[in-house]
């Protein structure tokens, strides 16, 4: 175990009644022995991302899978009298469903981002304006559920930790129309 300097400690309380101590520790990052590859990533709704090697990672859609249970628990909550103990118990049940979805999504994003960082030295991602894309009310739930921004943030901070390169390709760059071999 590495010895680092503890900057601060924060106690967090979740809506489900759990407490967590969050430690901010400063230490020197260890260089990761990655394979030195290069990869381009295109995120999507059906597939979470497709890479330039032809691999596709399916979108787990945790929110969609838990939607029935979430709707049922929220419906029960709406029928409880405000201020009652039963309403508070039901509020915790709704929060537990949300917490489970969040934990599943975070685990998936951490695993995928770490896998990409370990296998590749250079990762090219599209510079998407996710906030603007969320304005499309038909796609907003799917885009939010996929958590592209969080995934890009994880790739960015992990690349800084381990000395990898992240290249943000402009949205209008015709990358899919340019041959990677000859340039035409």
Question: Where are the regions that the model predicts?
Answer:
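Positively charged, helix-rich recognition surfaces that bind polyanionic ligands
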Residues: 2-5, 13-184
